[in-house]
C-alpha cells in the first residue's frame, strides 16, 4: 500500500522578472545627450528643460549637462538638464 496520498500540484511558484526601474542619474551628475535619467511606469517624474520622454515614459537628456530635480508640489516632480557653459 502507498504510504503517501497522491498530492495535487500547487498553484503558486511564479514571479516576474524585476524591471530595473528608478532614477539612473542623480542630481549634480554630469550627463551626455542621450543618457537615460529615469526609467518609470507612468509620469512619476516629468520632463523639464533639455529632457525628452520616450514612449515607455523613460526620461533622457537632450543635451550634455548637469542633472537637476525640481519638486513643484501638486504640479509634479520635474527633471532638468542644465547645459554645460
Curated annotation (Swiss-Prot):
Gene3D superfamilies: 2.40.50.100
Entry GO CC: cytosolic large ribosomal subunit
Cited InterPro entries: Ribosomal_bL27, Ribosomal_bL27_CS
Biological process, per Gene Ontology: translation
Region (Disordered): 1-21
Molecular function per GO: structural constituent of ribosome
Keywords: Ribonucleoprotein, Ribosomal protein
Family assignment from sequence similarity: Belongs to the bacterial ribosomal protein bL27 family.
Function: Found on the solvent side of the large subunit.
Record note on quaternary structure: Part of the 50S ribosomal subunit.
Protein name: Large ribosomal subunit protein bL27
Organism of provenance: Thermus thermophilus (strain ATCC 27634 / DSM 579 / HB8)
